[in-house]
């Protein structure tokens, strides 16, 4: 009888460690991965083509649903591309608000990443710790937009509205005592800026808890050290960006190398790894959360000291004030025309790249002068990273596959688009 040495295994698309709908066809020699063939496209929704049939301002909601755990960072690149096309000035206060929410989104993304990675590798407790913190940031999303995830808060020319002067509070239920309700509402008595002042102090302590659980944990290091190694030279050749690139020791960050918004006015460092393995990518993301926390604090201090408009006064892209719209027919017509027909942009093409939590997220728009893009193309960091799956997995044990997939931090909303 013939002896079969290699065999093929389907990993996903419904495997809990596939992080979405990834289908991997693994060729195994015993328990060693010989070849990995990633199949993508199972979450394709035609976002780029949909946006080409909508006015520019009606596609912001689509951006939230690309990488659906880094919502406002997707919006950020899209509205900046429209602003570049229109040569539109954004008020400074709006820029600080955008940067603050972009860094909140980075923390949201990395907390979900460390929680999911922990579960993949058998560390359940970190999931509970991370989600406890994420709730506070989702409350900030809800306070400015009314939605806890798909906010559509960034607009061409600024943001939809200024920061609220009152944070939402928990209500007492039959499951919580009056004393406990008062305790959890203690930091919600003032404005959002007051709440964030309290958050940045508490968040450092929360990161210390996760550090204690994982960083020097012997089992965690056994599952991540020297697993999925990518050298700095190879990471550049493969087109890696974000933590995947910085984990290999390359200090490339668009917020520093090609500053946008007000990042050139803020003080922060770029964490880098040394060995390019799963453990280094974990350390980089943990350090990035601390840097994002510092950036949020700097934005809060500036916003507290400086008032001003949060949306451009260019009436071509900015809707009228709501109270004016309810009292004057001209403003009502303006509002209706703006949100039904949108606005035309000059002919031309632009590309804007931002430092997304997963890497460089880019938006390319080609305009023919109409009120909708002639062509919209998005550069998703996850697509580039997942293209290197064969190289990352080959030679490793089957049990290392979830660790490597997890540290890539892939979400198929933006990979498949």
UniProtKB/Swiss-Prot annotation:
InterPro entries the UniProt entry points to: NADH_Q_OxRdtase_suD, NADH_UbQ_OxRdtase_49kDa_CS, NDH1_su_D/H, NiFe-Hase_large
Disulfide bridge positions per record: none
Domain of life: Bacteria
Localization annotation: Cell inner membrane
Catalysed reactions listed for this entry: a quinone + NADH + 5 H(+)(in) = a quinol + NAD(+) + 4 H(+)(out)
GO MF terms, alphabetically ordered: NAD binding; NADH:ubiquinone reductase (non-electrogenic) activity; quinone binding
Family to which the UniProt record says this protein belongs: Belongs to the complex I 49 kDa subunit family.
Name listed for the protein in its UniProt record: NADH-quinone oxidoreductase subunit D
Species assigned in the record: Francisella philomiragia subsp. philomiragia (strain ATCC 25017 / CCUG 19701 / FSC 153 / O#319-036)
Gene that produces this protein: nuoD
